[in-house]
Regions:
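Active-site metal-binding core of divalent-cation-utilizing nuclease and nuclease-like domains
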Residues: 62-68, 107, 111-157, 171
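Intrinsic disorder
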Residues: 38-41, 66, 82, 95-102, ...
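Short beta-strand-loop-alpha-helix junction that forms the active-site gateway
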Residues: 152, 157-172, 197-200
Length: 258
């Protein structure tokens, strides 16, 4: 079989699963499974169908003969799974994907803020309870969150997207923030977490230092696992809602938090 035929088959059948095998962080697999098992039945079923790329987005329903067109409701591109949950430029402009991203970020920031002797700088447009990271990083760079504790600086950059793009997203962020990390490291001890997460809650192996990062910050092992499970939970639930609204007008909900 030619390479193009193989890629076409993977695109329509198992590209998500193949990406998880290649890029997922093994040490968080147990946590992901435990979260998924406790999901409401509708979200659990959605997640399983997501993994097999057999959800009723238009490119699929058109291929199944159940829709006249396979195009997106908002733009002239095909409404593939990846397009719905992270690729549509109109959805991006409407800040649909920001809502998912910032819901996760808010959870991480609030948990970190509860630690002793830390100052949290976090870039969340909908929330005014944190100082801007640019106070530390300057205007040229603005990572999602910076935490200062004495002479240590903890930097986290969160990216959420389609699983086949996890590694590419992580590499892009690594290159983007390297100058900042190098600059801060001249005077401080810097810990950088490049947290690339798939839309189904899969954590990329580029975040292999996640447990050490949290431990150094002051979280216990139990607290770290809870926070990772919560990250996965929020990611799955928000992706489910984004998919349900794929053909509908968007009114940004409050950030998902508990």
């Amino acid at each position: 079989m030619k390479k193009n035929s193989i890629e076409t088959s993977l695109t329509t059948q198992s590209l998500v699963i193949k990406s998880i095998w290649s890029y997922a962080l093994p040490s968080t697999a147990r946590l992901w499974s435990s979260v998924l098992e406790k999901m409401p039945r509708n979200i659990y079923t959605f997640s399983i169908r997501y993994l097999g790329n057999c959800l009723p987005n238009r490119s699929n329903t058109h291929r199944w003969g159940a829709a006249v067109s396979g195009l997106c409701s908002f733009c002239p591109n095909r409404q593939t799974l990846g397009h719905v949950i992270g690729g549509c430029k109109i959805s991006l402009e409407e800040k649909r994907f920001n809502w998912r991203h910032n819901s996760i970020l808010l959870s991480l920031a609030r948990a970190t803020k509860a630690l002793p002797f830390v100052t949290v700088y976090c870039d969340i447009e909908e929330c005014q309870e944190f100082l801007s990271p640019s106070i530390i990083s300057g205007d040229s760079f603005r990572p999602n969150m910076i935490v200062v504790r004495e002479k240590e600086i903890f930097v986290i950059e969160l990216t959420v997207g389609f699983e086949p793009n996890m590694q590419k997203n992580a590499l892009r962020k690594q290159q983007r923030y390297k100058p900042l990390i190098d600059s801060l490291s001249k005077t401080q001890s810097v810990h950088f977490l490049n947290l690339s997460v798939g839309a189904a809650g899969i954590i990329s192996n580029d975040a292999a230092n996640i447990f050490n990062w949290m431990k150094n910050l002051g979280f216990s092992q139990k607290e770290s696992e809870y926070l990772i499970r919560k990250t996965i939970n929020i990611c799955i639930r928000t992706t489910y809602y984004l998919f349900c609204r794929r053909d509908k007008p968007w009114e940004t909900p409050k950030l998902l938090s508990w």
